[in-house]
Amino acid sequence: MISQNKREKIALEIIRTLFNRFNSFPQDSSRNRNAPFHEAFLKAFSNKFNSNVSDIPYFISLSSWLHGLNTTLGQSFFEKIAHILSNGEKREYTTGKYGSLKISKTQKGNANSIITKLSNGVSIPNLVRENSQIFITDESDLVNAIDFSADLFFNDGDEIVAIELKTVKPNSGEMRGEKQKILEGKAALYRKFPDKHIEFYLGFPFDPTHDPNDPTGYDKIRFMKSCINMNKYFAESEIKIAS
């Protein structure tokens, strides 16, 4: 159950987002400098618009506004709501923030080996097996882990939970890089918090493949299949979808 205090904080974020977007809502399409070029191209699709679009310049302005709304939701709104719900924060282990973390050469080598085998199709994602290879303490030299951040980071008693929030349509080449970052991130957090259980996930705000009449529902297996290479690099247990 979400507390009243958290409900009020979420409501405030919604009001802020609405206020900012109301101020930028298109009123005059003539100010859209790109409209003449877009309009010329869109005329080629006029037979597909039918009666749904009567004002192409305004349609272009509205599309630009919607793109800005998508950016706002993806870059800040979902993240802020996640922080409120979990009492978490954004955490960046980079040279410019909390500093890069160290992992052992063995941990780094094991992470690279996991990635190579997944990329070549030699193995399939297996969270238990992968964790056993990176959650280790050994005497090999320490090296820098890849700089990484977690859009949502919180200490939940006996465990550290990190979640990288992504758009629901990630780029086709993202999955390998995200997996590499998460593997080294988990290895680094394991060394930094040796008495904690470490969890690191990819998180998504909703399932775009689900019935729009049931906006809080999801089908994780179907969603993962819709994302290029997600099943190649991630186990189902590594993915979180808001509901």
Residues covered by each model-derived region:
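Conserved catalytic cores of phosphodiester-cleaving nucleases, focusing on short active-site segments
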Residues: 86, 150-169
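Domain-level recognition of nuclease-like catalytic cores that cleave nucleotide substrates
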Residues: 172, 196-243
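Mg2+/Mn2+-dependent nuclease catalytic core
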Residues: 168-189
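Active-site metal-binding core of divalent-cation-utilizing nuclease and nuclease-like domains
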Residues: 98-157
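Surface-exposed cleft-lining segments at the edges of enzyme active sites
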Residues: 66-69, 134-141, 167-173
